[in-house]
Amino acid sequence: MKRWFKYVKPYLPYFIIGPLCMIVEVLGEVIMPKFLAGIIDNGVQNRDIGQIVFMTAMMIVTALLMMAGGVGGSYFGAKASVNFAADLRRDVYRKVQDFSFANIDRFSTGSLVTRLTNDVTQMQNFINMLLRMALRAPGMLIGGLIMAILLRPSLALILLVMLPLLLICMTICIRKGFPLFNKMQEKIDALNSNVRESVTNVRVIKSFVREDFEKKKFGRSNANLKQAGMNAMKLMIFLQPIMMFFMYTTTLLVVWFGGNTVIAGNMQLGDLTAFITYITQILISLMMVSMLFVMSSRAMASSRRISEVLDEKIDLNDDNAAHTDLQVKEGRVEFRHVDFRYYKNSEDKVLDDITFTIEPGQTVGIIGSTGCGKSTLVSMIPRLYDVDAGEVLIDGVNVKDYSLYHLREGVGMVLQKNVLFAGSIKENLLWGDENATDEMIRNAASHAQADGFIQSFNNGYDYDLGQGGTNVSGGQKQRLCIARALLKRPKILILDDSTSAVDTATEARIREAFRTELKDSTKIIIAQRISSVMEADEIIVMNEGRITGIGHHDELLKNNKEYQEIYYSQMDKKEATA
């Protein structure tokens, strides 16, 4: 509760005023039957028009006050719940933004989206309902019960028999509800993950003619969610008829015994009418409570899932950084006996005893078979992952001693998977330097061999890339990402297979731009093609998570078996022997 009070406190007036407004509505509901009884007993039976008009006027005034209270309660309840949800959603989003890659790996993307949207909405709806019903339902129950007892204690005994039976049924339903709603949220996770994956990769699906497979896959996820939803909704389907059964049974018993009492002359007809109204109010208030508890079961499941995100321990932080103001100045990179596993309990190392040094301004290529750990290795430099053993140093300082902000400001990465965001080309390039001028942007794009195709678009640099950059080709995406990195002008630039979708001539011009524009920056190039790294100052050869060779192209071609295999598999034999 302490956690959630943090989100209640800023809007405490709304949380207080809303229920107080509902009290006005409850008082009106309790008083109304007495006015109705007065109209019947004192007005209709005595044929007193004045009494009827007076009581009717009182009922109208009371109804207006009830309406004002109801509107006020709904308004302040909505204000409180919407603000609560907005602040909670903001904090969950900020927490996710602080996640390391390892943290994100523990949650699926679809699950995080569900928790940010659906789960927060469930809590918002529950709070809105709670503020409207928390005082109204108990107020109607207690007020109706008191008035019923005051009117006719003997008839009120009927409630003492029916209420315990009703409460037992409600308790059973609520206890069964929590695991069912929790299961339902998990199925929503699975469905969201399925939808996100299929929509994101729709081009691949169409190119492999897998639409039918994906439709069936979605159908299974949708059917699972439907079944989970039906299982949860069975509570409502079961609970509502029970409530109605008890309501009608209680009303019939009251009408039977009360009618006999009226016929015997021991009770007035107006009082019986008021008593029946109070009984109805009591049972309706119990229905409200049951609805509230059913919603609370779903909200509790959602709150647990949100708490899992908020309680997730961030694997990477700079709380223990020794030099929080230190910035990357030279770009010297050193690995000392680094080991790494993606899963701490795994026996297989992704990186095994990695040791090397890159001097400032050097261009170093990293090459090796697919899955040998190249991308994982460079992820250690900006601390996207932390090492299990050994240490990574930049300018002689352990990366853990830098603040994450200053460390990552000094490192630029063009990832293997090129990522662009919805918006214009200019907006995407400004990620590299938000203060860059138009001239700087165009210069970076020109060196990345992107200015030509950008100018061919109708709006040039204001051309809308679409969601995820879907309006440009793979090669154009790569060049835009390179331009973004050039604009950042980092001390360490990491290129993770970033020119795989461009031709060799364009790649050569991009490499030349790196040499001239970033001559003082350390450049690390991961590549599948030897032509991409053969002119590097040094080349690191990797195989199965280990370094098998470090040296120049000619040196490795003579002495390193893995490098020879890659080279001869890519080069024409005549060219290789020339």
Q: Which residue ranges define each predicted feature?
A:
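Transmembrane helix-loop-helix hairpins at lipid-water interfaces of multipass membrane proteins
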Residues: K9-G72, F76, I149-S154, G265-L269, ...
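Short intracellular "coupling" helices and adjacent cytoplasmic loop segments at the cytosolic face
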Residues: N46-R47, V82, R90-T114, N118-V120, ...
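Helix-loop-helix
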Residues: R47-F54, M147-V161, N231-R305, V309-L310
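Juxtamembrane helix-loop junctions of ABC transporter transmembrane domains
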Residues: L20-C21, G28-D41, T62-T109, V113, ...
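ABC-type nucleotide-binding domain
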Residues: L326-A578
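An intracellular "coupling" helix at the cytosolic face of ABC transporter transmembrane type-1 domains
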Residues: P10, D98-A102, N118-I127, L131, ...
